[in-house]
Amino acid sequence: MARTSPPPPVCLALQGGGSHGAFQWGVLDRLLEAEALDFRAVTCASAGAMNAAALITGLEAGGFDGARKTLDKLWREINLSGGKNVFGDSAIWNAAFSPSWMKDTPLWRSAESLAMTMSPYQFNPFNLNPLRRVLDTVVDYEAVQRSDIRMFVATTAVRKGRVRLFENAELTQDVLLASGCLPHLFQAVELDGEPYWDGGYLANPPLWPLFYASTPDDILLLPLNP
């Protein structure tokens, strides 16, 4: 049921956590269905960054209902990509996107062994990533770039060992892939000639941008890791 009064403005903080990002989808879907909150800014990392990009894409295209549809499409596409990935049904991909109980199985252990003995530069020399197709299908980068909803995406600068934030105007597919780049699975993503890894290593998610930006005081944090 639609609200009779404007929803309160808030900032959203979306933590990364691989396939656990689907939990955020569920929470966001319920909030959007209730038209409960007016999202003015989103700070995010890794899977949270992909949720954020889908959220803003949908809000810009069709409001609350549009955001629900876009998030639904994101996770359905991710689910489909799991069976059509660069590694096929190999252990390393399936283990990375499987529930925690998988860690005690031979599948997970073989994936760990592979990750310790080979780098993605060896087992994935062409740097193929099924998430590229998913993001191309779901995210409208131009819509996010011009949106009034501020977005802060965390990445890890490999050589400097520091976090780097990207905002709306800088958002590209490579920025999202860098924010979710696990170095045991994928080659580092090059941005402006510098290699980047998953932003969750140093800021999961970064909260300080919200302290200094002209954003609402209230922050809704959706954690994926305790």
Language-model features, listed with the residues they occupy:
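Small-residue-rich anion-binding loops in enzyme active sites
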Residues: M1-A13, I149-R150, V158-R159
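Patatin-like phospholipase
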Residues: P6-A13, G18-F123, N129, L135, ...
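Active-site-adjacent alpha/beta core region of enzyme catalytic domains
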Residues: F87-L222
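Cofactor-binding loop segments of dinucleotide-utilizing enzymes, especially the Rossmann-like FAD-
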Residues: L224-P226
